[in-house]
């Protein structure tokens, strides 16, 4: 008998849960609701909310909008978004994650200090990611984004550095960057770093590694756009080479189910629990066949 188990620690983080709840609440009123960008980096959940009436728009479409209601997702937005909304009489339903909001405020405070010209505000994150765009926006576009310790080489080590992190990045990689900067910063410059990684995300990594290591086969469920999904899937691979990234049940290769005694189903902070349950049930059907 093959055991199939869902990782109880996987699924939406509280920021995403709040954003989806706010969307459902507004849609239940029967009014038109727009969302600036995909509410979550999971196509199946986006499709579910679209069926309920949620209209996803891009930034160009947002700029053309007038007298409407727009949901801002958990990732957060730059100040410009709120300015456009005010100008165009757009009602904002703000679902920015409180962890992201606190980070935005800290970066803005650092940017407004008198000695800004003498230092660099550096953000460890994915270039172009929605959260990172919102963070860089707090500095009027002047923050430097780096994706790795390798990219830290482009920094000016004769100038002081203030380092922040996208909330969903790897704690280990953040520490690597910290050590690299400490090693190369000029004695005349100062270096301060702020561990701004969400603990709900960071704490998942050891638990996920443990879960992946206890099963013969892992199906990691995540949208292909999810930055957090890619990072967590890599953690699964480190402890279990028989880990496979899938977006939905149709991507399961039935031949993988041969000669295994236990299968684990887990996912990213952008993966809905209902989708993992659907995949669990689909695996059970394949096993019976």
From Swiss-Prot:
InterPro entries (UniProt xref): LytB/IspH
Free-text comment on the cofactor: Binds 1 [4Fe-4S] cluster per subunit.
EC number(s) reported in the record: 1.17.7.4
Residues binding dimethylallyl diphosphate: 41, 75, 129, 226-228, 270
Biological processes, Gene Ontology terms: dimethylallyl diphosphate biosynthetic process; isopentenyl diphosphate biosynthetic process, methylerythritol 4-phosphate pathway; terpenoid biosynthetic process
Catalysis: reaction(s): isopentenyl diphosphate + 2 oxidized [2Fe-2S]-[ferredoxin] + H2O = (2E)-4-hydroxy-3-methylbut-2-enyl diphosphate + 2 reduced [2Fe-2S]-[ferredoxin] + 2 H(+); dimethylallyl diphosphate + 2 oxidized [2Fe-2S]-[ferredoxin] + H2O = (2E)-4-hydroxy-3-methylbut-2-enyl diphosphate + 2 reduced [2Fe-2S]-[ferredoxin] + 2 H(+)
Gene3D superfamilies: 3.40.50.11270, 4-hydroxy-3-methylbut-2-enyl diphosphate reductase, catalytic domain
Family matches, as Pfam families: LYTB
Pathways per UniProt: Isoprenoid biosynthesis; dimethylallyl diphosphate biosynthesis; dimethylallyl diphosphate from (2E)-4-hydroxy-3-methylbutenyl diphosphate: step 1/1; Isoprenoid biosynthesis; isopentenyl diphosphate biosynthesis via DXP pathway; isopentenyl diphosphate from 1-deoxy-D-xylulose 5-phosphate: step 6/6
GO molecular function terms listed in the Swiss-Prot or TrEMBL record: 4 iron, 4 sulfur cluster binding; 4-hydroxy-3-methylbut-2-enyl diphosphate reductase activity; metal ion binding
Gene Ontology cellular-component terms listed: cytosol
Keywords, comma-separated and alphabetical: 4Fe-4S, Iron, Iron-sulfur, Isoprene biosynthesis, Metal-binding, Oxidoreductase
Cofactor(s) it depends on: [4Fe-4S] cluster
Enzyme class label: oxidoreductase
Binding site for isopentenyl diphosphate: 41, 75, 129, 226-228, 270
Binding site for (2E)-4-hydroxy-3-methylbut-2-enyl diphosphate: 41, 75, 129, 167, 226-228, 270
Source organism, top-level taxon: Bacteria
Catalytic residues as annotated in Swiss-Prot or TrEMBL: 131
Ligand binding ([4Fe-4S] cluster): 13, 97, 198
HAMAP family xref list: IspH (MF_00191)
Function per UniProt: Catalyzes the conversion of 1-hydroxy-2-methyl-2-(E)-butenyl 4-diphosphate (HMBPP) into a mixture of isopentenyl diphosphate (IPP) and dimethylallyl diphosphate (DMAPP). Acts in the terminal step of the DOXP/MEP pathway for isoprenoid precursor biosynthesis.
Protein family according to the UniProt entry: Belongs to the IspH family.
Record-given protein name: 4-hydroxy-3-methylbut-2-enyl diphosphate reductase
Organism from which the protein derives: Bacteroides thetaiotaomicron (strain ATCC 29148 / DSM 2079 / JCM 5827 / CCUG 10774 / NCTC 10582 / VPI-5482 / E50)
Gene: ispH
